[in-house]
From Swiss-Prot:
Modification sites for Phosphoserine: 44, 85, 100, 113, 118, 148, 151
Protein purpose: Cytosolic prostaglandin synthase that catalyzes the oxidoreduction of prostaglandin endoperoxide H2 (PGH2) to prostaglandin E2 (PGE2). Molecular chaperone that localizes to genomic response elements in a hormone-dependent manner and disrupts receptor-mediated transcriptional activation, by promoting disassembly of transcriptional regulatory complexes. Facilitates HIF alpha proteins hydroxylation via interaction with EGLN1/PHD2, leading to recruit EGLN1/PHD2 to the HSP90 pathway.
Natural source organism: Rattus norvegicus (Rat)
Gene3D superfamilies recorded: 2.60.40.790
UniProt keywords, alphabetically: Acetylation, Cytoplasm, Fatty acid biosynthesis, Fatty acid metabolism, Isomerase, Isopeptide bond, Lipid biosynthesis, Lipid metabolism, Phosphoprotein, Prostaglandin biosynthesis, Prostaglandin metabolism, Ubl conjugation
This protein's name: Prostaglandin E synthase 3
Catalysis: reaction(s): prostaglandin H2 = prostaglandin E2
Domain of life: Eukaryota
Induction line: In brain, by LPS.
Amino acid sequence: MQPASAKWYDRRDYVFIEFCVEDSKDVNVNFEKSKLTFSCLGGSDNFKHLNEIDLFHCIDPNDSKHKRTDRSILCCLRKGESGQSWPRLTKERAKLNWLSVDFNNWKDWEDDSDEDMSNFDRFSEMMDHMGGDEDVDLPEVDGADDDSQDSDDEKMPDLE
């Protein structure tokens, strides 16, 4: 029996943990206020996996859930205190070789003023703030309309 490899990421109201076990069977996930226990049989050889995690902060076990797919089991843990950042998943600072941060899904939501806004909306908003309005009065720049010679118009000295 060994722990299943897992990836995790943090959101404003939830913490997500994905246990990477293909063809899992007999999946058992137990949510407690400050602990998560995961077990299953995985792969073609029905290898037994067991993970016990003492969580960094408390969760709401009644509002936490999991979903099994052919490739993994995704656990959605409802935070006990919404909006509280989790710098790590576990209570202990020890590095666990089976646990890593899911940087593909990681988002620095603390600096994000509107989490629900889609990427397209952000792009559209950014484009709206770009130039292109003809009614905008731009400040005068000295020499912008001059036809005088610039320093790059001068002849370069020959190389020796």
